[in-house]
Amino acid sequence: MYHSFNIAVIIPCYNEQKAIAKVINDFKTNIPTASIYVFDNNSTDSTAQVAEDAGATVHSVPLKGKGNVVRRMFSDVDADIYLMVDGDDTYDASSAPEMINHLIKNQLDMVVGCRQENGDQNTYRKGHR
């Protein structure tokens, strides 16, 4: 259903070199028609290079803070549908097509996903409940 839409997966990042390639590849697998954008916020590791090597379009955001990055993402990327995910592999990319189809089918402005509580201590990091 979503294949005729311009979909952008936008990923704010700071020091996510260990997880970013998996995140990019998972979303490329689950939404093959989407464009993947990584917005690096002054990482001191190789996040930007790893993301580029994985096939993402990488933007550098020099102003510190996730708020600055989010504003830049929505300003710099033109798409019909935006899917914003974190670069630390905490969201299941296989849920994305269902969420996008739900958005389109029901003519919604926004759909918000959330990790499910499953008893796993790693579901939510401390301070993220």
Swiss-Prot record:
Provide the GO MF annotations for this entry: glycosyltransferase activity
Task: Provide the GO biological process annotations.
Answer: lipopolysaccharide biosynthetic process
Pathway-wise, it operates in: Bacterial outer membrane biogenesis; lipopolysaccharide biosynthesis
Pfam families on file: Glycos_transf_2 (PF00535)
Q: Which domain of life is it from?
A: Bacteria
Keyword annotations for this protein? Glycosyltransferase, Lipopolysaccharide biosynthesis, Transferase
What family is this? Belongs to the glycosyltransferase 2 family.
Protein name (database record) = Protein RfbJ
Instruction: Name its species.
Output: Shigella flexneri
